[in-house]
Amino acid sequence: MTTIAIIGLGNMGKGLAKRLAGKTDLVLASRDHAAATAFAATLPAGAVVLDQASAIAGADIVVLALPFEAALEAAGNPALKSKIVVDISNPVKADFSGLAIGHTTSAAEQLQAAAPDAKVVKAFNTIFAGLFDLPAAQTAAVPAFIAGNDEAAVAAVVELAVLAGFAVEKTGGIDAARLLEPLGMLNIRFGYGLGQGTGIAPNWIKLAA
């Protein structure tokens, strides 16, 4: 069974852990070990709580469920060599007025540069944390947009997304994150800035062959 390490237990990390619990070998790591242990105890199948270095070392897939700057710092860990690393971040400005980087780069590409021997895959950045609390049947048509350069790594993250109860849209290489992160920012604007709430998600509708 694949071992998935979730680094960071904010709303996104906890939401993904809830969806994956009992479906894979799940390892959690957080700065607050006691809080992580208490959260793991609430999961139906439980989860192993380790320090970040140990969690990464034993994982097949490492989900950096962290804000961009923290994810970039974590990407410098040499233990990520040869690992599949999932970047779920949107590099938003501190005041949420827009993205701090973009056009010619992306958060995912910055992480790949910081961890050149890892296989970075962008995913879940257009999904609000609250959707993880819905029954999986309600999110089965909600796509996780996925971008990455390594085909095997992308395939593994596709499986992870489906396991977590979402549909999948593959968008190409890691440079596609330059498009996905503005899409994530647009979703944030709709949800918070324009009052639509967080029970929303972008999707592509095929109207004709």
Show which residues each predicted segment covers.
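NAD(P)+-binding Rossmann beta1-loop-alpha1 motif at the extreme N-terminus of oxidoreductases
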Residues: M1-T42
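Short, well-ordered coil/turn residues at beta-beta hairpins
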Residues: A65-L66, I88, A123, A147
